[in-house]
Amino acid sequence: ASKKGSKIHYVPPYRGETRLQLAGWLGLAVDRLKDYVSRDLIRAIVSMREIKQPEEIAQLEEVAQTGYRMHTAAMAMCREGLTERDVAAELDRIAAAGGGRTSFRSIVSQHGETLHNLSYDGRLENGRLLLIDAGAENAMGYASDHTRTLPVGGRFTEKQREIYDIVLAANARGQDLARPGVTYQSVHLEAMRVIAEGLTQLGLMRGDPAEAVAAGAAALFMPHGLGHQMGLDVHDMEGLGEKYVGYDDATTRSTQFGLGALRMGKTLKAGHVVTVEPGIYFIPALIEKWEREHIHSSFINFPKLRSYFDFGGIRLEDDILITATGNRLVGKHRPPIAPAEVEAAMTR
């Protein structure tokens, strides 16, 4: 085809051996492959894979049940004296027993403020929060992805419950708004407004919540996006490039801190499967940096935040299918999420 002058279409190769093979065929240096990928082919693949067919939805429903068992088992075993590694090992065991494996390396951490903390060295301590971001992958390769945050010892403190309720409200708001014709970027911003409003009521933020979100101030507490597509990859098709998977000509990626980390921003369509995963994190180094540099000081009550430096973080993540009229949860059973449900699951 190359000798005939025909255009050769390929997508960004993922595996190392494929990169070497393709570079050899095309006579290119490996680091030049990215310069000649076919945007037409990428867009065609995205358009087919992003709309989940009934057979795919059935696979996602199946693996979601394994994810449910993983999280409820973690809740039942979460107690002082165990290690984060003990919980992670049980998640691995249940995923394997379900016929597959975990869909990514599980996050099991009492330092929820570290967004992708893959260390399992901590020993569980009463009064602390344990953030568990974990999912399963089934034999067909389809993935689940849920996050729950648990109070070690089985009961939320009043301070923890205040923050938890804000995150839960943001999760609910995101699910209320997600439907065909709505950009997920707008859903993200509304979830952020709920977070800013709740933190303002607690005195941790000040001013108008909508203005704080527009300015990017609320991203101090949630420096990531509301969600991403799911399917055969837990971050579905991410290797093809988020600007094609999560964005399009009508919706471009923001450069603003926090909002720019949103992986899925474009208009939702029936058949999309996306995560809804708001969070609130108290990251001492980031808070101190913003305070030192007077970043958004009109919106943030820095002195009051010092009493939250040992808080950690809370994230609550569900997987939803966009339907013709709105959305629904993927999976027959939702991992416990209301505070009373979580506490009950931890005392069985």
Predicted regions and their residues:
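Active-site neighborhoods and metal-handling regions in enzymes and metal-associated proteins
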Residues: A1-R348
